[in-house]
């Protein structure tokens, strides 16, 4: 199955249709805009916490002409939900999945990542049980572990863009695209 999350391109259209597609496809799993899934296999447990990152970024909430649904989401309620999920997560692996990166080697402006660091990133670092944050948005592959951090930040997206010179960041382990 595909465990889906919305991204900025979905917010240009009918975001509820992305959620509702779960009723059409047996492979598409997205019961709501943010949700959790526990997978157990061979004695190992994995908790996926899938989040809707577009409403966490101020520029999307402010641009209601292009992203009409972003300003209607209660992003603080979502962050509170993530905090509660992480407070009780006891699985062997805890992986948080969203569309936008918290850290990235890119030439894109920093405002989105600064918003992500101040919102979701703050909560992830508060809890010592998060193993990995997986996202897309940048259109290449990256692995980052910030110095002193225990979370692996993985950007796993369609490598449709060649890597352009971006601002070097501490902790970049790998970048290809």
Predicted regions, residues:
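Extended active-site neighborhood of metal-dependent phosphoesterases/phosphodiesterases
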Residues: 1-90, 109-132, 139-177
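Short acidic, glycine-rich surface-loop motifs adjacent to enzyme active sites
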Residues: 89-106
């Amino acid at each position: 199955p595909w465990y889906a999350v919305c991204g900025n391109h979905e917010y240009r259209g009918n975001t509820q249709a992305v959620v509702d597609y779960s009723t059409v496809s047996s492979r598409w799993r997205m019961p709501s805009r943010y949700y959790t899934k526990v997978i157990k296999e061979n004695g190992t447990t994995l908790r996926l916490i899938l989040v809707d990152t577009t409403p966490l970024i101020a520029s999307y909430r402010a641009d209601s002409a292009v992203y009409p649904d972003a300003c209607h989401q209660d992003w603080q309620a979502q962050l509170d939900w993530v905090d509660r999920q992480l407070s009780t997560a006891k699985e062997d692996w805890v992986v948080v999945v969203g569309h936008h990166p918290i850290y990235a080697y890119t030439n894109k402006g920093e405002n989105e990542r600064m918003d992500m660091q101040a919102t979701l990133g703050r909560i992830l670092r508060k809890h010592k049980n998060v193993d990995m944050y997986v996202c897309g948005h940048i259109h290449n592959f990256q692995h980052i572990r910030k110095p002193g951090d225990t979370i692996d930040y993985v950007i796993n997206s369609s490598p449709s863009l060649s890597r352009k010179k971006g601002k070097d960041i501490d902790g970049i382990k790998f970048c290809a695209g």
